[in-house]
Amino acid sequence: MTTARYNRVVLKLSGEALSGDQGYGIDPKVIQSISKQVKEVADLGVEVAIVVGGGNIWRGKVGSEMGMDRASADYMGMLATIMNSLALQDGLETIDVETRVQTSIEMRQVAEPYIRRKAIRHLEKKRVVIFAAGTGNPYFSTDTTAALRAAEIEAEVILMAKNNVDGVYTDDPKLNKSAKKYESLTYLEMLNEGLGVMDSTASSLCMDNNIPLIVFSIMEEGNIKRVVQGETIGTTIRGK
């Protein structure tokens, strides 16, 4: 069996990735595909934690722009991530991958509350852990959640899976055909160039805690496994 480069990873999924071509909601075929890819990685013995966004259902920023109270809009976004997390848990357990959902906002009838040491214990037992409801606080993105949880559980890398791009480019490759893809970057370069991979709070957390980030496309089957095994795909961001 081919060995993995990493022992413990955080997989960051955007909510949009779960909607597939329909652009909204949850596409069962996408859930099946992602679940299969996560299983491939778990079967290598890698400990997998997942943070999923909620943009396929609701974005707090959009609600705020509509005139809603920003905190209320963000809490709605957190609830959307829980819906996505439960769908992904179901997809994983359908193919016999033992999975736990932990939420930053307590709802014990639905999932476990987030407890760092319990999450680590689940990972050590080779269960997949899905962190839902963001950080539990408004004004913080799920990218920041991924960075925070990665630091807390001492993950070796954050795998940022994208559904519409295969790495980080100098410009939007859909609008600018001459845009070049970066193979590697530092966090400072990413921030200074305004590349918009993740927000500055998340970037600073990763940089300060020396957590590398790999941005890649999830649309090609097997890509998560390839990244975990050390293949050079996408863009790697690290250090200062």
Curated annotation (Swiss-Prot):
Region (Involved in allosteric activation by GTP): 20-25
Subcellular location per the Swiss-Prot or TrEMBL entry: Cytoplasm
RNA-binding among keywords: no
UniProt GO MF annotations: ATP binding; UMP kinase activity
Residue numbers binding UMP: G54, D74, T135, G136, N137, P138, Y139, F140, S141, T142
Entry-linked InterPro entries: AceGlu_kinase-like_sf (IPR036393), Asp/Glu/Uridylate_kinase (IPR001048), Uridylate_kinase (IPR011817), Uridylate_kinase_bac (IPR015963)
Presence of keyword Nucleotide-binding: yes
GO biological process: 'de novo' CTP biosynthetic process; UDP biosynthetic process
Assigned protein family: Belongs to the UMP kinase family.
Function: Catalyzes the reversible phosphorylation of UMP to UDP.
Protein's name in the database: Uridylate kinase
Organism: Oceanobacillus iheyensis (strain DSM 14371 / CIP 107618 / JCM 11309 / KCTC 3954 / HTE831)
